[in-house]
Amino acid sequence: KGWLERARIGMDERPDALMRGALATLHKHAPELKVASAINHPSSICDEIDDVSPVIMYANGFSPETLAKRRAAGHKTTYYVCCGPERPNTFTFSPPAEAEWLGIFAAAQGFDGFLRWAWCSWVEDPLQSTDFTSWPSGDCFLVYPGGRSSIRFERLRDGLEDFEKIRLIRGYAVRAKLIG
């Protein structure tokens, strides 16, 4: 069924020293397994990670050349936001346009997409409060129980649709140059 090609061992937001040990263990005992990681600091181990997502504050460390090299090697590179930065983000107090901007930024920077850590990690009563501990309101979820959407999700989806349109147009433009 192709599960091995789709599976990833996730190692998120860990110091490089811990990542190096884990990667060495994986390479030794299960070299066929691929690794995904969200990284929240500049890191020298990105070349060893099949599916890497830097936090937006470090996204500029991935030049167009680096992204092309990773893509040619079969690696995926997205970026993410989490409980930081305050802007742009998808918090309940964020201007809705910020959520849409996230997909457009991914396209503009040449990333393969955008990583969102939580879709529906609901708090006790998400219809009454979107707060979870000290995290910004709404960080844990984009949709509500019972099939309820949110303006944050709808605008993020719009931005991801824009991302996909841009990706398709770029592909058509490349093919047109080759043909024509």
Where are the regions that the model predicts?
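Aromatic- and carboxylate-lined catalytic core of secreted/periplasmic carbohydrate-active enzymes
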Residues: 87, 105-180
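Catalytic-core regions of glycoside hydrolase
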Residues: 1-127
